[in-house]
């Protein structure tokens, strides 16, 4: 589950991570943002974070926005890292108007970090997360985020396991669970301010 292992011995159940990040980035671009940071965990070749970075880059490219590697902030995928990355971004003063985060917990930490720096979400900076954790809709403002059906991944894994028990020689399958964007209040229109 959630692996990009290319071994033909294993089934694969995952989401299209690149497309999810593309959706998030395209959403903020659609709201008029051009200076968009990317908050993520450690980028590993063929990993989930790398796929999400590719989706971010693709959305920028399609919109004619040059990719700037200095706007990619790597940390850990946790709350404290989100706080730290927000502080770092504020201290570097890069005129960023939006952040695409690779996980809700990272985005939620970033919201706290921005708050501590006197930066208002979404008035001063917009943010989009990834996962659609239950808490994301209870925040103020509610976190716009990429929704992935985690329970559906589990159901598909059990289904594949049972099928494989009945037929040990079955062809290995790759199942891709669709993602969608949960629009809430953490992104604002720029109205030609950039």
Regions found by a protein language model. Name each.
Residues 1-23, 65, 105, 131-143:
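Flexible loop/hinge segments that line or gate small-molecule binding clefts
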Residues 2, 14, 40, 74, ...:
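Short beta-strand/turn micro-motifs composed of small residues
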Residues 11-13, 70-73, 144, 175:
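Structural signal for short hydrophobic segments within the conserved structured cores
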Residues 21, 74-92:
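Structural motif
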Residues 24-63, 173-187:
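An alpha-beta-alpha
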Residues 31, 85-193:
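Flexible loop/turn connectors
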Residues 34-35, 67-71, 121-126:
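Short acidic capping loops at alpha-helix termini that bridge into adjacent secondary structure
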Residues 57-81:
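Short beta-strand elements in bilobed, periplasmic/extracellular small-molecule ligand-binding domains
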